[in-house]
Amino acid sequence: MNITTALPLPTHLLSEKVTAPLLGARKIYVTGSRQDIRVPMREIALTPSSARYGGNENLSLVLYDTSGIYTDPQATIDLACGLPRLRTAWIDERADTVEAKLHFKVPESVSVTAPPFPTPPQPLRARDNVAVTQLEYARRGLVTPEMEFVAIREQQRREQTVENLRGQRHAGDAWGALVGTPITPEFVRDEIARGRAILPNNINHPESEPMIIGRNFLTKINANIGTSALSSSIAEEVEKLVWAIRWGADTIMDLSTGRDIHATREWILRNSPVPVGTVPIYQALEKVDGHVDALSWDVFRDTLIEQAEQGVDYVTVHAGVLRDFIPLTASRLTGIVSRGGSIMARWCQAHRSENFLYTHFEELCEIMRAYDVAFSLGDGLRPGCIADANDAAQFAELEILGKLTHIAWNHQVQVMVEGPGHVPMQLIKANMDKQLAACGEAPFYTLGPLTTDIAPGYDHITSAIGAAMIGWYGTAMLCYVTPKEHLGLPNLQDVHDGIIAYKIAAHAADLAKGHPAAQARDDALSKARFEFRWQDQFHLSLDPEKALALHDESLPKEAHKRAAFCSMCGPQFCSMKISQEVRDASSSELSDANTDINTSDGI
């Protein structure tokens, strides 16, 4: 694999640790109805069972893969060139775009310390009075290549996978979701047309591999990255991007608030195979030197267009923080904890005016539909502690977000709705129920929720508990929380730990909903565990490297990977080994009994 970078680093940005194929996995591509629809998947080949366990072949397992070309040994990675623009031909074929006239240029007065991306593409926008959104195409009955790509990706060779299940597949409870329906391109189109799913694919981010967010599909996770005024750099954030998607992030959000926001975002977009989201108000605030009072609709509009031209796929907009709702937060224990929400609340107070994102919402929609940028309607009044959960401010904003959802749909703009936050377990389901009712089943996208406030340093765990629950109830995408939540900017290890916690939560939710293929991986790993196929256990796990490392801490020899025990129980007390001995003895006794019957008098 060839890796080059124009970033000013003493060593290569992307180490073998970041780009090597996952342990025991092979990148494969499934071709669709046309040769340029090549859907990446991860195949795990399994070893045969030993003679004691029947000596049967164990068929390989195909898994959803988000890592792009970075884990493909045949790919050449050049960060200065970016990823292949796989969707360019599809966009051009629709003949509904033109070159954008407005293109961001760094003002001479702005000090830029980061290297600009060497070859930024010419941005596109829709032709006049045309919407270029996947929602518009879906409502017209058009099945796009993006929709077919998604259908193949979500289906995961489901028929083969389910057929290979040895154990009983438990019935799930999907709370009204259509889990189990075959994922066809037409099903994808229909879900998008109904607003129950979004396919976030800005026409200026052709490098992205199409994916879908909706409760009738696999539960997705998002990872937040981004520079701050005090820490991190472009190089670190690009590395975090590649690291995050390696472990399973379905989308990433660039929440940069430090210098060089535009350059950071360009490097990330050009090298991201997953959708990229942002919160434009952060950059808008940087443009007015951090003075909230100086913010305006004009500054925000120009910032949004700038980001849309770069290729941002979805944006968080805190348009539901209305002036009348601010007093509802006065009695809260922790006030307004959303950065965007607090900014807009402060602006409303300073100007004694309504939130300009709310009053200009239809103009926002006109911009979004010209690039196919999806709304992620921000929950600026989400609870920031358990004490504030499910209060009047939170649900007043949710009702407004529901109204804005329908306005966006009327403009053919894709929408998902953000949710909390900090919520104790007994109050979680009410959040899902209220969102479905208020927002017409638009996808729900939640931060956790954290189920307790007492564990700084472990909030990836406190929040994964809530994430698993709300994912089961129907949340379409879960925003990860890292161990650094409330404490600092996450590093690579924090990103890894947050993603693994949320992959567990998302998979647990899919199991509980009864997703047809979800249990296949569990069953394959359980079978490997019972048969002491250690390498297969490692390869099937969410983090093969850690599983192997923990095993080898106490039993490092190669022979130990063929042993019928681990260091927990040893060779004499392994329950699974004893269980197989019980089976063998029972089988022998049954065989002897049958022999006795067959040889007795009169038979």
UniProtKB/Swiss-Prot annotation:
Catalyzes the synthesis of the hydroxymethylpyrimidine phosphate (HMP-P) moiety of thiamine from aminoimidazole ribotide (AIR) in a radical S-adenosyl-L-methionine (SAM)-dependent reaction. Its EC number is 4.1.99.17. Pathway: Cofactor biosynthesis; thiamine diphosphate biosynthesis. Binds 1 [4Fe-4S] cluster per subunit. The cluster is coordinated with 3 cysteines and an exchangeable S-adenosyl-L-methionine. One of its GO terms (cellular component) is cytosol. It holds the Pfam family ThiC_Rad_SAM. Gene3D superfamilies: 6.10.250.620, Radical SAM ThiC family, central domain. Coiled coil: none annotated. Its cofactor is [4Fe-4S] cluster. This is Phosphomethylpyrimidine synthase. InterPro entries: ThiC, ThiC-associated_dom, ThiC/Bza_core_dom, ThiC/BzaA/B. Belongs to the ThiC family. The gene is thiC. Keywords: 4Fe-4S, Iron, Iron-sulfur, Lyase, Metal-binding, S-adenosyl-L-methionine, Thiamine biosynthesis, Zinc. It catalyses: 5-amino-1-(5-phospho-beta-D-ribosyl)imidazole + S-adenosyl-L-methionine = 4-amino-2-methyl-5-(phosphooxymethyl)pyrimidine + CO + 5'-deoxyadenosine + formate + L-methionine + 3 H(+). [4Fe-4S] cluster binds at C566, C569, C574. GO terms for biological process: thiamine biosynthetic process; thiamine diphosphate biosynthetic process. Zn(2+) binds at H422, H486.
